[in-house]
Amino acid sequence: MLNLKKVIALVCTLALVITSVSVVSFAEAYTDVTESSAYYEAVESLSKLGIVTGYEDGTYKPEETVTRAEMAALIARIQGYEETAKANANTVFTDVPSTYWASGYVAQANGQGIINGYGDGTFGPDDAVKYEEAVKMIMATLGYTPYAMNNGGYPTGYLAAAQFYGVTKGVSNAVTGTGANRGTIAQLLANAIDTPIMGQSKWSTDGSVEYTIYDGKDNNSYKTLMSENLDVVKLKGVIKESSVANLKGTKEINNDEAAKIKVAVTGNYDTNNKDFQFDSDGDYTGEDTFLVAESDAEDYLGMAVILYVRENDDNEYEVISIAADGTKNDIVTFTL
């Protein structure tokens, strides 16, 4: 352990050769989801955001099938509606009484047009949610129903939209017509919350509606569930300082202070958050110091990164997720 108040002249040159990017590091939350697990990054990120939870024995059970009621609850969480939707509510389905644990989630998702029943008045809350049903619910949540309906409807149009916009990226061994497991659902949700949402942008007097995908292109703003519903800000930049080192070779160390990183922010993905803005000259004037929290953000010193931060109860921003920026990193050399 370092107990020095100042570290000077630990002089060594480090050449960081980046051959693989898209790495997110956290302390493992579940005994059955290790770094070698296919859905490790997705499960860990969603756990940090409070979207998925594990079991009392410390496991996540990624191979266990998700039910339709559980999927309705997850849909509420990725929209930030957990508190309002979890209360018991009346539903239109004969097999989902107000006393059912997920009645509030089911009622809300049905009211939003995200979920449907079987056509006989039932919902089948304890039935396994099929892969294509889960994809449909997610893409409808993102606003892509008009796109899907113009490209084959259910399920073809929704599956096509999910593939085209990257929601199914990293999903393996998922088969339509079969129940989706917790690992697959985690990957879909992790992709979805960082996917540009689609929404109505223009209404005409003749009743026609124009839709926009808010992907930051063609003068459109950049909007995702993370930015609009979960209060998570996406940034890019270079980490220039950690709690123990910086790129100048000297660093004051305070053992009583929580670990932080300092970032030279180069992009804010058009966030509307006032704490992360550039001035009229293009100079960044926003927050640039973030709590490391449970991430391994300090391991990225000197690297170009994409990071996600969120304000905590103490009004400080902490790192939720971090990854090397594959479009920027090649070889970075610095001296400590």
Which role does the model predict for each range below?
Residues 68, 182, 301-302:
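Short, flexible surface segments
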Residues 327-336:
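Alpha-solenoid helical-repeat scaffolds
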Residues 2-38, 53-103, 112-132, 138-179, ...:
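Feature responds to low-complexity, polar/acidic, surface-exposed segments characteristic
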Residues 44-52:
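Mature N-terminal segment immediately following signal peptide/propeptide cleavage
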Residues 289-307:
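Short nucleic-acid-contacting surface segments enriched for D/E, G, S/T with interspersed K/R
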Residues 46, 109, 162, 301-302:
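Basic amphipathic alpha-helical segments that dock to polyanions
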